[in-house]
Amino acid sequence: MAVFLFGNTGTFNRGCEAIVRASKKLLGYRATHLCTSNPEEDKMLCRDIGLQMLSFVPFSRLQNYKFAALRKITGEFTTGFETAGKQVTDLITSDDLCLMIGGDTYCYRPPYYHMGMNRYCEQHGIPSALW
C-alpha cells in the first residue's frame, strides 16, 4: 500500500509543510508520495524526509478561465481534473490510500482539484480522507 498526499501548495506554506512532515512520521516506512504543483519548492522537503514527489499539471491562466467557464455552464465542478490529475491517477490503485492535506489552502479558492481527486477515488474504490 502506498500513501498519496494531495493538496500541498509548497513548503513555503508552513502549515502544509508541518502536515507533510507529521504525516510522514505517522506513516513511517510506507511508500509515501507528495503530489504537488510546486515541484521545485518541494524538492528539498521530499529529499529531506524520504518522500517521492509527483507533480500534477497546473493550469495556465487561459486554461483556468476555460475550465471556469465550462464549470459555470455545465455545473460540473470537476471539469478539467482529468487533464490535471492524469499523471497521478495513472499510478493509484485500490490498494493505496489518498489523504487530502492542505490546511488553510481550502480557504483561498474552491478546491476543484481536490474535489476531482476525491470523486476519482470514490469511483475507483480507493480509500481517501480529508487529513
List where the protein language model places each region.
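Aromatic- and Gly/Pro-rich donor/ligand-binding loops
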Residues: 2-131
